[in-house]
Amino acid sequence: MPTIQQLVRKGRRDKVAKVKTAALKGSPQRRGVCTRVYTTTPKKPNSALRKVARVKLTSQVEVTAYIPGEGHNLQEHSMVLVRGGRVKDLPGVRYKIIRGSLDTQGVKNRKQARSRYGAKKEKS
């Protein structure tokens, strides 16, 4: 514990909060190229084949990003837009791919929460 004299001389140093989406370099989204598209299994107690992609961003960082929604058209060399947001049951996946922008198509036959999945309004 410092003395009062030491605090007068140096003061306290503020703690710097760790950034959760460091690869975006402060941007809300970043463009990137898929280097690998594959499925992985979640941690216990969940069970599924979650669709993920390794993406090389314009910030020269390679990240693992989740592909939300049912079905996708992504393959190697697809251009994608990546945002922050982790997937709780996939360790190391801290980014999500934005559906309906660049090479990523929106989810087909989506009725609710359409804007999150890049789905157009159905013509009635």
From Swiss-Prot:
Q: Which Pfam families match?
A: Ribosom_S12_S23
SUPFAM superfamilies, alphabetized: Nucleic acid-binding proteins
Keywords of the record, alphabetical order, are: Methylation, Ribonucleoprotein, Ribosomal protein, RNA-binding, rRNA-binding, tRNA-binding
Q: List the disulfide bonds.
A: none
Task: Spell out which residues are annotated as carrying 3-methylthioaspartic acid.
Answer: 89
Which Gene Ontology cellular component terms are annotated? Answer: small ribosomal subunit
Q: Which portions of the chain have biased composition (kind: Basic residues)?
A: 108-118
Its domain of life reads Bacteria
UniProt GO BP: translation
Disordered: where is this region? 1-30, 105-124
Assembly = Part of the 30S ribosomal subunit. Contacts proteins S8 and S17. May interact with IF1 in the 30S initiation complex.
NCBIfam families, per the entry: rpsL_bact
Function recorded in the entry: With S4 and S5 plays an important role in translational accuracy. Interacts with and stabilizes bases of the 16S rRNA that are involved in tRNA selection in the A site and with the mRNA backbone. Located at the interface of the 30S and 50S subunits, it traverses the body of the 30S subunit contacting proteins on the other side and probably holding the rRNA structure together. The combined cluster of proteins S8, S12 and S17 appears to hold together the shoulder and platform of the 30S subunit.
Q: What family name appears in the similarity comment?
A: Belongs to the universal ribosomal protein uS12 family.
What's the name of the protein?
Small ribosomal subunit protein uS12
